[in-house]
Amino acid sequence: MEPNVVDHTSMWSLISNASIVVQLVMLTLVAASVTSWIMIFQRGNAMRAAKKALDAFEERFWSGIDLSKLYRQAGSNPDPDSGVEQIFRAGFKEFSRLRQQPGVDPDAVMEGVARAMRVAISREEEKLEASLPFLATVGSTSPYVGLFGTVWGIMNSFRGLATVQQATLATVAPGIAEALIATAIGLFAAIPAVIAYNRFSARSEMLIGRYYTFADEFQAILHRKVHTSDD
């Protein structure tokens, strides 16, 4: 009898004996968990690459290199992971284009540069925040989806008591156990997603803040450059 009890209460047995609704809930949560883990690894690698590229480009930028030379280097060998490089290229390209126009007002040049860099920052912000809405959704909804599966399973367990002459704990325990697995899977999917979302949100805000700081400093350099040459 003991092997039968062990088999009846094993994890796989509980899942396979669950109702179709509970199994669908479990399958949905497992799929959400697997997808969120894939996105967690992808976002983690992307964030590390973006920070590494930012540090490397700022080191080159503040090394005293000529801005035109740096622009040519960035254009000939662009780094797709370097958001700050894209911001620099957008700003300097607009600066060079407007400066070539005869009689253009210096303030109009700087307004164009600021506008171009704001657009570039917005694009980089979208890249950094990719997948974060999905992680937030998984983290906030998975426990409730799991709870729905649990409630449904417990309801089925108690409905099954109507066909039993004598209700005992052994009668309802397997049904309740299989229902609680849905809640466990929901928490397993939600907890990593919430942690990853908070961590990546903080990293994204830090990188975006540094992008804005770089843009302000770069604008200050171009402002001096355009007004000095104008004088």
Swiss-Prot record:
Biological processes annotated in GO = bacteriocin transport; cell division; protein import
According to the record, the segments passing through the membrane are 20-40, 134-154, 176-196
Gene Ontology cellular-component terms for this entry are:
plasma membrane
Question: What highest taxon heads this organism's lineage?
Answer: Bacteria
Keyword set, alphabetical order? Cell cycle, Cell division, Cell inner membrane, Cell membrane, Membrane, Transmembrane, Transmembrane helix
One protein family per Pfam: MotA_ExbB
Membrane topology listed for this record: Multi-pass membrane protein
Cell location: Cell inner membrane
Protein family:
Belongs to the ExbB/TolQ family.
Per its database record, what is this protein's job? Part of the Tol-Pal system, which plays a role in outer membrane invagination during cell division and is important for maintaining outer membrane integrity.
Q: Subunit structure of this entry?
A: The Tol-Pal system is composed of five core proteins: the inner membrane proteins TolA, TolQ and TolR, the periplasmic protein TolB and the outer membrane protein Pal. They form a network linking the inner and outer membranes and the peptidoglycan layer.
Q: What is this protein called?
A: Tol-Pal system protein TolQ
Q: Which organism is it from?
A: Pseudomonas aeruginosa (strain ATCC 15692 / DSM 22644 / CIP 104116 / JCM 14847 / LMG 12228 / 1C / PRS 101 / PAO1)
